């Protein structure tokens, strides 16, 4: 459950380290984002030589949440941190590597490049 002002870790090697959610995309009254949703973020911490700089506004897809997500079969999945992968204008990941597991809901949201780069899909 990601909402405005939520801080997220970055799960790729784009150069950003921490994001802050500004807006959840998908409707004017939409408050929360979950696995596979696109959010607009501000970069709060970044590496000095990375592709993404501090203060930049970027779009990202949520790949891990602390809040549990209920699957269709009734099972629950949750992670130790909130994390996202930064996207470019064509909804492809900016980084070339993905760190840590990603939820299966990312595949259902048609982010196949992220799923193929991820070391584990839970």
Curated annotation (Swiss-Prot):
Pfam short name (any one): Ribosomal_L14
PROSITE patterns: RIBOSOMAL_L14 (PS00049)
GO molecular function, one term: large ribosomal subunit rRNA binding
One record GO biological process: translation
GO cellular component terms given for this protein: cytosolic large ribosomal subunit
InterPro entries reported for this sequence: Ribosomal_uL14, Ribosomal_uL14_bac-type, Ribosomal_uL14_CS, Ribosomal_uL14_sf
Keywords for the protein's UniProt record, in alphabetical order: Ribonucleoprotein, Ribosomal protein, RNA-binding, rRNA-binding
Family per record: Belongs to the universal ribosomal protein uL14 family.
Function: Binds to 23S rRNA. Forms part of two intersubunit bridges in the 70S ribosome.
Complex formation: Part of the 50S ribosomal subunit. Forms a cluster with proteins L3 and L19. In the 70S ribosome, L14 and L19 interact and together make contacts with the 16S rRNA in bridges B5 and B8.
Annotated protein name in UniProt: Large ribosomal subunit protein uL14
Organism for this UniProt entry: Campylobacter concisus (strain 13826)
Gene this protein is translated from: rplN
């Amino acid at each position: 459950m990601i909402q405005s002002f939520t801080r997220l870790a970055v799960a790729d090697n784009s150069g950003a380290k921490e994001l802050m959610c500004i807006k959840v995309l998908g409707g004017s009254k939409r408050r929360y984002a979950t696995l596979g949703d696109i959010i607009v973020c501000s970069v709060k911490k970044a590496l000095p030589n990375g592709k993404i700089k501090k203060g930049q506004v970027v779009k990202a897809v949520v790949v891990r949440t602390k809040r549990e997500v209920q699957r269709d079969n009734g099972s629950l999945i949750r992670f130790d941190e909130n994390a996202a992968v930064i996207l470019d204008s064509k909804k492809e990941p900016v980084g070339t590597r993905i760190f840590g597991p990603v939820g299966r809901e990312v595949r259902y949201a048609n982010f196949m490049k992220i799923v193929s780069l991820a070391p584990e899909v839970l």
